[in-house]
């Protein structure tokens, strides 16, 4: 005969197991995102970023909000830099997300500080004054929305990123 405690033990262990899996996935995302950002920064001789749990929580909140609203916009009145990435019907790795932003480097003219097309995601990644990054992803309904926050923010008009 099963005791009451035995009956309830499996759900507790399942919860602990799932929490451990989620934490491991979170650490992997943190590692891969930070490594990818710092690889791009190293290409231009900019000091590496450090990971911020505070910025990550903010990024997760905004990614979840965007997914729930089915909207893709920057957070209004933010005091942080922000990069967004959206993909539908597929999944992206942290390295693919960062490399998509980094590919904008071809649109950036360092001498004039002007972009030919979009380059703000790239310049935020390599902004020399930025010290911390925190990123998150929200998934659902065939969509992935990635958000990275940067502190201090970059992309000041007329200034070179490094």
State each model region's role.
Residues 10-20:
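Bacterial N-terminal signal peptides
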Residues 1-12:
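Bacterial N-terminal signal peptides that target proteins for export
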Residues 2, 26, 155-159:
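Membrane-interface soluble catalytic domains
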Residues 23-81:
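Short, well-ordered surface patches within globular domains
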Residues 80, 90-162:
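Disulfide-stabilized extracellular recognition modules
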């Amino acid at each position: 005969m099963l005791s009451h405690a035995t009956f309830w033990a499996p759900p507790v262990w399942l919860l602990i197991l799932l929490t451990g899996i989620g934490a491991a996935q979170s650490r992997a995302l943190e590692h891969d995102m930070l490594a990818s950002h710092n690889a791009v920064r190293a290409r231009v001789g900019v000091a590496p970023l450090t990971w911020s749990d505070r910025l990550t929580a903010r990024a997760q909140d905004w990614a979840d909000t965007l997914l729930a609203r089915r909207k893709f916009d920057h957070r209004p009145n933010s005091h942080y830099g922000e990069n967004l990435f959206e993909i539908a019907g597929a999944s992206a790795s942290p390295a693919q997300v960062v490399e998509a932003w980094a590919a904008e480097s071809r649109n950036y003219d360092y001498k004039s500080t002007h972009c030919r097309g979009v380059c703000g995601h790239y310049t935020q990644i390599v902004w020399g004054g930025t010290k911390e990054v925190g990123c998150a992803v929200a998934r659902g309904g065939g969509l992935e929305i990635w958000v990275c926050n940067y502190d201090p923010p970059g992309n000041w008009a007329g200034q070179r990123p490094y």
